[in-house]
């Protein structure tokens, strides 16, 4: 490659979305260490000599093809690999990747599909390819890895030289000015925008609120929902039917972080939009559900109308050689099994300048047409090159634009603010998805609001926002743009997020979640019977029917309030089906020692799973844990002198499972640690004690739930005994901590141990009775429809139910000014 511009100083205000942080120089980007979860593949593999790895790999793959008379890299007569281009220089590839109707169905793979009569065979000698083959789960993926590696090794995959069509010697960077006054006057021919929303997850209400904020009748909205997010897809289909200028892609891909599939999604969306002749759009803007506007639609339209010939992309702001190295552009990647596998080195094609930065951009129609439909050497070969690239959307459009005839239209600004906090966001949190160490921006909080009020630079969107983490900042921004909702508007401080919906099927739930949801239903019905029932009346007594219908997380003022379980029941008085919703709230389990110690740094302690080091919270809201889970202990600290504390984990019968010391530095805010406990954990209420100089400071409790379901079926006695008796000999670790029991006044009661042993054999109603109680409270119950219980409230009239009014996220008719908000 060559660069057409001198090296630039690193910009301190760079807000690019790419994963090449300025302070991330010394991280090993490889991902070849064994994974933490148990796998069939042997973790010591990476340490063995390369030749032995190859032998084992050959045996493994060969065993699967046994009887087919094929070598490791061969295929049986009926096993056809996905079609793929024969060679990078083939100009027909651009046609293959171009014109398709937007009604096309598509899979979720990111790499272009290959067609080859003969599978290339070669000696797979690269350690990265061997590692990928060893870790890939499906046979199809292993074949793709082998095929791609061999084609690359034979020089059939990557373009060596690419034509540059930009007439400029260096990189163009048009300056654009932000004039607060000028944008108040709408031009006579305002631009119309195609908003492409690429969304995933389950935060449908946050998506609807964002959509409400960006909607205008003059623009167009094309929505792609990740093919793994079926609940969100159902919600999007439902609200999109209300508006003629909203369409949902009929094809769906699995747009994994860093994957080639995201670029495929953008390119296919562009082709679709260009073929919609009834949508005369001028600009393409990509957004996610974690974005929010920070200026109004009128301001955005006035600005883009003034610069309608420009393309807005944010560059990395550092020299190209370093960018290529840190972004792994000189490495070959392949996406399959919803993972990006690193397969080895490659060369950057000669003849062009490689650029990159943020994968959030605003592109004009003329350039989108060029990228989508051109079959010239640059576009064709860049599509091939970036089909095997990590984070391709962070570089493909930059590189094509900078080397194309449109190069003089580039503005080095993507008109966004991104909330980077490198210390928190660069925790290699995507290593389970990508063979690479990546970064991600943080969620905005109320203390960041001043950043949206700056008027010097043209910025129109910000990210990231997550209502499940902090909704207050979204409310502040929404009011800043569009004014406050009327006084007394319900639901403004509430947030609901679905975690289960009946069409998902119970197979989508873990046995722990299914167990707990059924327990919550029983607790709710017990509450209804005790608080609503009158003597001699059965009208408020119910019998549960089937599995939960839906489950929501409920937050109020950014505090988790518990689960809302919608479920079907039979009313015992009239023998008719009704549908109720039960609100379950966790009890407070953190307790400061009494009398309090003079150690004042500890503010809070919690145990859970799915610790998010970036946002510093447990994503397993409510801490639903079962015997086979691996809990993490978290502590939150105030500032103070360096200290060492002792953490002790105690099981339900006072067996000390683990003890360890933590050094708390003076500036530490959070610590977390997952002790390597032998499984299964004994069901019941556990205690985690925190001591300073062996003086108790505080303790927190957590429930390990015994499972009433195994593989979604009622658990059998032999399964219950195996899962609910604790680890063999009650040994959670090789080392015994029994000598600490007298020191901590933790006495092991033989009767208690015997009762725990009996509990382990429980199934059916006995098991259910053991489970309920303790750590959760049924706060309220309501009916979603008609009910024979005269004192049962209707869910839509409560403040807490997922059926209660939520005007901030509800989508209605278009207002006279063309907006929804």
UniProtKB/Swiss-Prot annotation:
Disulfides per UniProt: 122-150, 166-407, 426-439, 428-437, 540-789, 782-795
Lumenal side: 1-821
Start and end residues of each stretch annotated as Disordered: 1-121, 801-821
Entry EC number(s): 2.4.2.26
Reactions performed catalytically: UDP-alpha-D-xylose + L-seryl-[protein] = 3-O-(beta-D-xylosyl)-L-seryl-[protein] + UDP + H(+)
Homology family: Belongs to the glycosyltransferase 14 family. XylT subfamily.
UniProt name for this protein: Xylosyltransferase 1
